Amino acid sequence: MAENNTTPAAGGSTGRHSHKKHGFTGQIGFVMAAAGSAVGVGNLWRFPYLAAKDGGGLFILIYLILTFTFGFTLLTSDIAIGRKTGKNSIKAYTAMSPKWSFLGILTFLVPVLIMTYYAVIGGWITRYIVVYLTGQNQLAAADSFFTDFITSPSQSTLYAVIFMLLTAWIVFNGVEKGIEQCSKILMPVMLVMIVAIAIFALTLTHTDDAGVTRTGLQGLAVYLTPNFEGLTIKRFLQILLDAMSQIFFSLSVSMGIMITYGSYIKKDVDINASIHQIELFDTGVALLAGMMIIPSIFVFEGVEGMKAGPSLMFISLPKVFASMPSLGRFVGLAFFIMAAFAALTSCVSVLETITANCMEIFHTKRKPTTITLTLVYTIASVVIALGYSKFYIELPLPNGSIGQLLDLMDYISNSFMMPFISMLSAILIGWVVGPDWIVEEVEYGGRKFGLKGLYRVMIKYIVPVIMFILFLTSAGILNI
């Protein structure tokens, strides 16, 4: 299909004068908020887990290459779409091409699903903060603690509701006074905390019952050294797909969040520079998370301990903190506070995206819209939290795993819908409106877009193919 630059918004009239009245005050506010959305719980447990599983430095190298090519392309697309149209995902895609309005609806459904369970995870983290605040760190290290907590109807729902209300309060206060102000405070504090814990992790040393001494620096070497043992073409493709799926978890792309945040930025903000800053911040936090977690796990539990998946944060790390000297309680508290900051800024961005779309569709004001959505998602969070007790079910997922309600929502939104949306978005930009539709917005006001050649190639040829493969793999149709 030939490129077509004659669609309604392609000429620029749709977006040049549609900037929203209430938005970020400037580039710093936007970058902090966008980075806050990107830096989530996935950076803290999933990235270190995949690095340990997929060859350490080999995974890191592949991830970095994909972030600054593949991730850069998707992030540029979402932010430019938002600013050029001045609209949220549902109406933004309609402005690009009326025949593709269905893509906006699909994109909107992703945060709608994610919001049902994100406050539940935030509630889990909040529970651990309370445990460490009250000096019960040895209790948190017990094998049954996490399971006992999530299967307790009263405890799991209470903390989910608390986290949901905190998220809603920030969104209720708007973009500038709520989201931007929150991000400007939480993100720098979180960065300082993760750097401090990472440095502390490198100083750790422990001798086990067998007399083997392991150090944090040895754990760092395990983390950063590329491991090519047993590497085959099939294994390399698995690592590649793992790295690409992590980018979805990490950069908040293909879920409408960056379109919404893009619609809030002013025309004098340099999109290209902002994107590089977001990528550096997000990737830096992921790398530091690995530097913090892998050496800590390695010192006290060895290589075997690093194979834990989602349980790493809530089961493995509390054991590590309990094994530390007197500082274990305080390190554990600092870690979970940092994790709460990451979860909160991400959860806020998800709820804000839903709120902004609803305000635009139904022509309602922020406060009543936020209150209504808070009621809806408080109920949804309670239902999902009870998925481990009152509403417990076992669901076979296409990837071969068995999950509960939370896992089902996560699979549909992250593993199934997001690759599909990215593929369709790339086709729309690359072959319907044309890459220059995006390039023009990035270069607006005489700004330089040095990587526009790379962007054109990625959005037209590489992203659609990779996303199609990832979609087939996630759907269980293609087994790599």
Language model region names:
Residues 1-45, 74-79, 83-95, 101-102, ...:
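Membrane-interface "cap" regions at the ends of multi-pass membrane proteins
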Residues 2-4, 122-151, 262-268, 273, ...:
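Helix-loop-helix connectors at the membrane interface of multi-pass transporters/channels
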Residues 12, 17-24, 184-344, 348, ...:
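Membrane-embedded translocation segments of transport machinery
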Residues 18-21, 50-54, 87-106, 119-178, ...:
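Inter-helical loop and helix-membrane interface segments of multi-pass membrane transporters/permeases
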Residues 26-66, 256-257, 273-276, 280-283:
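Transmembrane helix-boundary motif of multi-pass solute transporters/channels
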Residues 29, 153-158, 281-287, 329-332, ...:
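Loop-to-transmembrane helix boundary motifs in multi-pass membrane proteins
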Residues 50-54, 80, 95-96, 102-115, ...:
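Membrane-water interface regions at transmembrane-helix termini and the short interhelical loops
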Residues 103, 355, 362-374, 410-467:
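C-terminal membrane-solvent junction of multi-pass transporters and transport-like membrane proteins
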